[in-house]
């Protein structure tokens, strides 16, 4: 058995464990309540056109409302209304042209992309036509935009077209700034307290959970993104890409943490890089590579073409999606194998069993809540084409944003609390390291939770004398 720095987990009673979970749920519930009361994420403004049943469509020029950096991004979508029976189903492809111009504050027109972009889009109508994304700007350089859209090659009887501008709600942007700042400050404090509590113990004596927490807490700081306000100060794609990169790094590190802990808690002593870490890094690294590739791919292509959508314009997207799902399935099976094996082998070891049960219980709660949030957001179509794309930094309401951030932050804070040593941990560890004092005449429950006799007051020595007399009589 490897020497371990003590954890507060060992000194908690059953009552304290219940209190830890209650505090976790209260904090998580507060974030959801604030999110429900918060503003909408997306604000829209519509511009409708009557085309008088003309089959010859001319280019349509659309001017956006005045924008600020708090609008973050800009989408232009279109819903086509056909002049035919609603029972008719149509699916046809047609080339669509788009030209985007920026309007400066003095009213002059600046050419963002001094050319007309041409992409093939699919119009799907079953009673009502599906929405088409015309253009998307990942960051805003100008206070207003003009988009010229061409549907000249759409050979269908058109009754009308409904164009909609979509941007982030400035009120939500301010909420996002303040709550990210709150979590950044709170995570920094928790990280410092956790490091301070372990300062008296050699890193060689840290448990695998404590070592991983020293990695996850700084990554959680990046996940909350202290550089996020730069996206409102600098007109650049870099802050948004950094945010995507930080999120993918933390989430994949969390996946790696689960694999390493459930395996490492069973393999005490030296953990070789080749046999212990390499397979886990390989599986999680593939997931990280797939998510980062899609994010960078989308960002770089949108810089040159506002019509670009990797779900529509990338022939390899289906292959990427299948690859991601296969690797995710391998990860889940491997994790379940490690959990089942650890639970079967360590269920009779008091200290290790306690670590295993607590991590499994809290992680199970977090995963159930996460799956519930995803189901409420996507419904039964959670594994359709929009799944990977929508799991990025885009949210549909404030409650969704705060629930995800609050869930992961409070999960790490709870783990940091139970894995950090208590105030008297150094003295207690010195006693436990001495075989003469370690678990002498104590059962497993007494060691973890304390016996009733230990909590009994001395009563001027009467209790001890009475116990000694009973033992003498029995002899």
Swiss-Prot record:
It is found in: Membrane. One of its GO terms (cellular component) is membrane. It comes from the Eukaryota. The keyword Amino-acid biosynthesis does not apply. Its main location: membrane. The modification Phosphoserine is found at residue 443. It is a multi-pass membrane protein. The chain crosses the membrane at residues 16-36, 131-151, 175-195, 214-234, 245-265, 276-296, 320-340, 356-376, 401-421. InterPro entries: TMEM181, TMEM181_GOLD, WLS-like_TM. Disulfide bonds: none annotated. Coiled coil: none annotated. Keywords: Membrane, Phosphoprotein, Transmembrane, Transmembrane helix. GO terms for molecular function: toxic substance binding. Mediates action of cytolethal distending toxins (CDT), which are secreted by many pathogenic bacteria. Expression level of TMEM181 is rate-limiting for intoxication. Interacts with cytolethal distending toxin. Belongs to the TMEM181 family. This is Transmembrane protein 181. It comes from Homo sapiens.
